[in-house]
Amino acid sequence: MAVSQTFPPGPAHEPASALMEPCARSLAEGFLEEELRLNAELSQLQFPEPVGVIYNPVDYAWEPHRNYVTRYCQGPKEVLFLGMNPGPFGMAQTGVPFGEVNVVRDWLGIGGSVLSPPQEHPKRPVLGLECPQSEVSGARFWGFFRTLCGQPQVFFRHCFVHNLCPLLFLAPSGRNLTPADLPAKHREQLLSICDAALCRQVQLLGVRLVVGVGRLAEQRARRALAGLTPEVQVEGLLHPSPRSPQANKGWETAARERLQELGLLPLLTDEGSVRPTP
């Protein structure tokens, strides 16, 4: 049986019009509007087996998600770190990409009410910032930048973090499914819509470099942004997943070396604006 989810801007969050000032729209409001547009487009899709349940934290965790965007996306961004889609113990709980609970609450300073998704899998309850499970990928990702940057404002001065796809897919057993696990036809329908949204988001933020976190995110970004004017550079970064033997050998060291190759370390550690290495 196909699974269909709807994500209307209903009681889970304010209507789109409430994000807009009468005379001017901020960059953060524009970004949130693009996310709501993407939600509306994705709500028309249906997904067959192996998908059992779909979560969209941009909907039910709207309050902390909105707080994340409005606090840290106030101006143009040179660099966008792009994940693929939410994890069950990260963004699915907090509404923040790679959003390990402790980092979101204690370092990023993000809070807010998290509602229950329309359909909740009993093995993957949404507990919001009370979730006791730590997401290893998120703890590694944000923990690295916490050590490198010191304060969130240093990181977000030139950078932002976003997921290509806002949806989390679960099998009937509760097992996490990545977009790569979906049937080819449905995967392409999903990611084509997300690709188009990424183009709009990158142009809105003025991004010059997209760093795909993981091979699939990098590949989709290259495909989506090919031929975009002005040109956007796309590079890759090893995913911090605990399922990656390479990441388990020392993701932080690998990440630092990669950022140094890309010329990004000065951008993340001092006040000067340093352009990414072409």
UniProtKB/Swiss-Prot annotation:
TM helices/strands, residue ranges: none
Molecular-function GO terms, alphabetical: DNA binding; DNA N-glycosylase activity; oxidized pyrimidine nucleobase lesion DNA N-glycosylase activity; single-strand selective uracil DNA N-glycosylase activity; uracil DNA N-glycosylase activity
Single biological process term from Gene Ontology: base-excision repair
Region feature (DNA-binding): 173-187
Enzyme Commission identifier(s): 3.2.2.-
InterPro entries according to UniProt: SMUG1, Uracil-DNA_glycosylase-like, Uracil-DNA_glycosylase-like_sf
Localization annotation: Nucleus
Top EC category: hydrolase
Keywords: DNA damage, DNA repair, DNA-binding, Hydrolase, Nucleus
Domain of life: Eukaryota
Binding locations of substrate: 84, 98, 163, 239
A Gene Ontology cellular-component term: nucleolus
Assigned protein family: Belongs to the uracil-DNA glycosylase (UDG) superfamily. SMUG1 family.
Cited PANTHER family: SINGLE-STRAND SELECTIVE MONOFUNCTIONAL URACIL DNA GLYCOSYLASE (PTHR13235:SF2)
Function according to Swiss-Prot or TrEMBL: Recognizes base lesions in the genome and initiates base excision DNA repair. Acts as a monofunctional DNA glycosylase specific for uracil (U) residues in DNA with a preference for single-stranded DNA substrates. The activity is greater toward mismatches (U/G) compared to matches (U/A). Excises uracil (U), 5-formyluracil (fU) and uracil derivatives bearing an oxidized group at C5 [5-hydroxyuracil (hoU) and 5-hydroxymethyluracil (hmU)] in ssDNA and dsDNA, but not analogous cytosine derivatives (5-hydroxycytosine and 5-formylcytosine), nor other oxidized bases.
Protein name in UniProt: Single-strand selective monofunctional uracil-DNA glycosylase
Species in which this protein is naturally found: Rattus norvegicus
Gene name, Swiss-Prot/TrEMBL: Smug1
